[in-house]
Curated annotation (Swiss-Prot):
It comes from Staphylococcus carnosus (strain TM300). Belongs to the peptidase S14 family. GO terms for biological process: protein quality control for misfolded or incompletely synthesized proteins. Keywords: Cytoplasm, Hydrolase, Protease, Serine protease. This is ATP-dependent Clp protease proteolytic subunit. Cleaves peptides in various proteins in a process that requires ATP hydrolysis. Has a chymotrypsin-like activity. Plays a major role in the degradation of misfolded proteins.
Amino acid sequence: MNLIPTVIETTNRGERAYDIYSRLLKDRIIMLGSAIDDNVANSIVSQLLFLQAQDAEKDIYLYINSPGGSVTAGFAIYDTIQHIKPDVQTICIGMAASMGSFLLAAGAKGKRFALPNAEVMIHQPLGGAQGQATEIEIAATHILKTRAKLNKILAERTGQSIEQIEKDTDRDNFLTADEAKEYGLIDEVMQPEK
C-alpha cells in the first residue's frame, strides 16, 4: 500500500491541501524514490519540462533513492536533464543503484551530492534473452552496445577512463558516499546543517 502524505498550506486566501510531491514541486524538488520504469520516467521528464517552462534560470533538485531499473527509461530522464536549460542538482538519499547511480552522475557538474550514509552501486546493464539462436545473438549485441554507451557516458561524467569503468562495473560495485565522491560520481558529501 502506497500512502502519499498530504500537507496543508495556509495563505491569506485560505487553506489548500497538496500531496507532498506537488508541494515539493513548488520548491523545484523532484523525488525519484522507486524503481525506474516508463511511467516513472514519464513523470520525472514531465516535471523537469514543467519546471523549465516555469523558470529556465533556477536550479532543479532531483532527490534519488532508487534501486535502478529500465535502461531506456533512465536514458529518457538522462537526456532530458542534459537537454533542459536549468541546472539539475542531484542528491542521493539512501541508495542510488544501477540506473539510479547513472542519473546521480547526470547532475550538473559541481552540483551532484550524497548524504553521508547514502550508498551508490554501479554495474553493467542486466538483460536476458530467450528464443532462437539468432534472437539471442541480436539481444546480446544490443546489450553490449548499451553497455558501451553507458560506460562512455559514465567515463565522461566521472573523469575515469573507459577501461576503469569497464573493470569497476563488471560486477556490482558498492560505494560509500565518500568513495562515490572520490570516484567522480558526485562532487560533495552533504554534511548535516545542525
